[in-house]
Amino acid sequence: MAATVNLELDPIFLKALGFLHSKSKDSAEKLKALLDESLARGIDSSYRPSQKDVEPPKISSTKNISIKQEPKISSSLPSGNNNGKVLTTEKVKKEAEKRPADKMKSDITEGVDIPKKPRLEKPETQSSPITVQSSKDLPMADLSSFEETSADDFAMEMGLACVVCRQMMVASGNQLVECQECHNLYHRDCHKPQVTDKEANDPRLVWYCARCTRQMKRMAQKTQKPPQKPAPAVVSVTPAVKDPLVKKPETKLKQETTFLAFKRTEVKTSTVISGNSSSASISSSVTSGLTGWAAFAAKTSSAGPSTAKLSSTTQNNTGKPATSSANQKPVGLTGLATSSKGGIGSKIGSNNSTTPTVPLKPPPPLTLGKTGLSRSVSCDNVSKVGLPSPSSLVPGSSSQLSGNGNSGTPGPSGSTASKTTSESSSSPSASLKGPTSQESQLNAMKRLQMVKKKAAQKKLKK
């Protein structure tokens, strides 16, 4: 039996040697195929008893070992000419035996249930080893394919292989290209349509696979469709569009009214004052004027040029603005004190003026230290402040107060002061009430009016 095995194995061993020493990549696969062929052919006769013996109890395993040892001994016995070959073939044979023997043992231990049936049925004993051998051959192929598929699956799971061909091989013109949407890898040749060089090599371009581009187009179409669907309902939408148009002017009007408060409404009310000189109409127009800080700002801003307003009144009557302004500047607390002591100055002014009744109004406390506090009392009371104001400068103030209403002060200042009082007091005032915030605002507006008149006169002179 050993001799027959040797005769059959010699050419196969030679082939195996050639495959062992060859440097080609396919040599390992060919060696494997050769081993499978040799097992499928006549060598299986040497393995058949071993398989039969391995299936029964342990005693048969000793027989199996002895049978395996026989071919080794017989292969080492041939003549000296073949000694070198035999030694090398022995190594190959050992390696070839180790692999299938180990796999056979593992297969047989796993598939013990399968060979139990042939033991019971004697006629099938011959065919049973064949089935076992076929099962032995199959696991070899299955294992190799399992290893390959597991590697491929691993590569696929890691996203390293092409989705179409399931390979990681990369050629110069066939690189792996990644889709930016689904992050699948495609070979340039595997993808349909094929990926161009520009798409593959240009890092600025974002590449999408054909499937993702289709999906994105569908999504874009879906997003474009919704505005087209409610087209028949445009009729119902139009009134909603009209409503804001109707509402807009209302809101604008509201904004205008609110903004006018900050645009100083006294500008408009001053026109009312110029038209109607009666204090009743003025008080009604002032009610919509400024209050709080804005009113205070109006007072302070208009308080400064109040002396210039006096000079403007004198310009209307006489062409001497400089003297009156010079005399009116130093009016301070002394002028206020003289005006508040009694109605003497006011009475003197009233003798010269057309109005017999002049109300006595103390100034608001905020403008005490300013130069225009004589004006801030009211335009009607200029007579009482205008007359005692020269008393701070001129020594003949006692004669002015004790006089019978004529200008007792020497120089042009007294005459100008009397003129200012007569001009300013000509406007009748029906308000005999105490000073209120509205009246102070009235005074501020009158001052503004005077400033405007003066500016217009200056422009005309120029």
Curated annotation (Swiss-Prot):
Disordered, as annotated region: 42-132, 301-462
Composition skew (Low complexity), residue ranges: 347-358, 382-437
GO CC term, one of those recorded: INTAC complex
One Pfam short name: PHD
Superkingdom per UniProt: Eukaryota
Protein modification: Dephosphorylated at Ser-128 by the PNUTS-PP1 complex, promoting RNA polymerase II transcription pause-release.
InterPro entries xref list: Int12_PHD, Integrator_subunit_12, Zinc_finger_PHD-type_CS, Znf_FYVE_PHD, Znf_PHD, Znf_PHD-finger, Znf_RING/FYVE/PHD
Biased composition (Polar residues): 59-86, 301-328
Key word Metal-binding present: yes
SMART domains, A to Z: PHD
Subcellular location: Nucleus
ZnF (PHD-type) ranges: 159-215
PROSITE patterns given in the database record: ZF_PHD_1, ZF_PHD_2
Gene3D superfamilies, per the entry: Zinc/RING finger domain, C3HC4 (zinc finger) (3.30.40.10)
Cross-link (Glycyl lysine isopeptide (Lys-Gly) (interchain with G-Cter in SUMO2)): 68, 254
Compositional bias ranges of the Basic and acidic residues kind: 88-124
Record-level Gene Ontology MF annotations: zinc ion binding
Modified residues (Phosphoserine): 128
Biological processes per GO annotation: RNA polymerase II transcription initiation surveillance; snRNA 3'-end processing
Keywords annotated in UniProt: Isopeptide bond, Metal-binding, Nucleus, Phosphoprotein, Ubl conjugation, Zinc, Zinc-finger
Ranges of Basic residues composition bias in the record: 449-462
Protein family per UniProt: Belongs to the Integrator subunit 12 family.
PANTHER family xref list: INTEGRATOR COMPLEX SUBUNIT 12 (PTHR13415:SF2), NUCLEAR FACTOR-RELATED (PTHR13415)
Free-text function comment from the UniProt entry: Component of the integrator complex, a multiprotein complex that terminates RNA polymerase II (Pol II) transcription in the promoter-proximal region of genes.
Self-association and partners: Component of the Integrator complex, composed of core subunits INTS1, INTS2, INTS3, INTS4, INTS5, INTS6, INTS7, INTS8, INTS9/RC74, INTS10, INTS11/CPSF3L, INTS12, INTS13, INTS14 and INTS15. The core complex associates with protein phosphatase 2A subunits PPP2CA and PPP2R1A, to form the Integrator-PP2A (INTAC) complex.
Entry protein name: Integrator complex subunit 12
Organism: Pongo abelii
Organismal lineage: Eukaryota, Metazoa, Chordata, Craniata, Vertebrata
Protein encoded by which gene: INTS12
